[in-house]
Amino acid sequence: MANIKSQIKRNKTNEKARLRNKSVKSSLKTAIRKAREAAAAGDVEKATEFQRVASRELDKAVSKGVIHKNQAANKKSALAQKVGALKG
C-alpha cells in the first residue's frame, strides 16, 4: 500500500480507468466476434451490419485511448476482408 497521498489518489484513478477500459474492451470483443460469426455463417447482410458496428466500436476505443489506432486499423481491415470475400 502506498504511503504518499498523491500515489494513493493515482491508485484510485488507475483502478477506475482499468475498469472502464475493461468494459470497453469487452464490448469491443463482442462486436468483433458477432461480425466474424456472421461472416463465417455466410450471412452477407448481417455481416455487413455487424462490421459497421464493430468499426464504430473500434474507433470509439481509439478515441478513449483504450487501444492503439494501428491495432484498430488492423482489426477493421481484417473484418473488411472477411466481409468482402462474402460479397465478392
From Swiss-Prot:
Keyword list, A-Z: Ribonucleoprotein, Ribosomal protein, RNA-binding, rRNA-binding
Region (Disordered): 1-30
GO cellular component, one term: small ribosomal subunit
UniProt keyword annotation of Protein transport present: no
GO biological process: translation
Keyword Oxidoreductase tagged: no
Pfam family, one: Ribosomal_S20p
One of the record's GO molecular function terms: small ribosomal subunit rRNA binding
Chain coiled-coil ranges: none
NCBIfam families: S20
Biological function: Binds directly to 16S ribosomal RNA.
Record family assignment: Belongs to the bacterial ribosomal protein bS20 family.
Stated name of the protein: Small ribosomal subunit protein bS20
Species of the source: Streptomyces coelicolor (strain ATCC BAA-471 / A3(2) / M145)
Gene name, Swiss-Prot/TrEMBL: rpsT
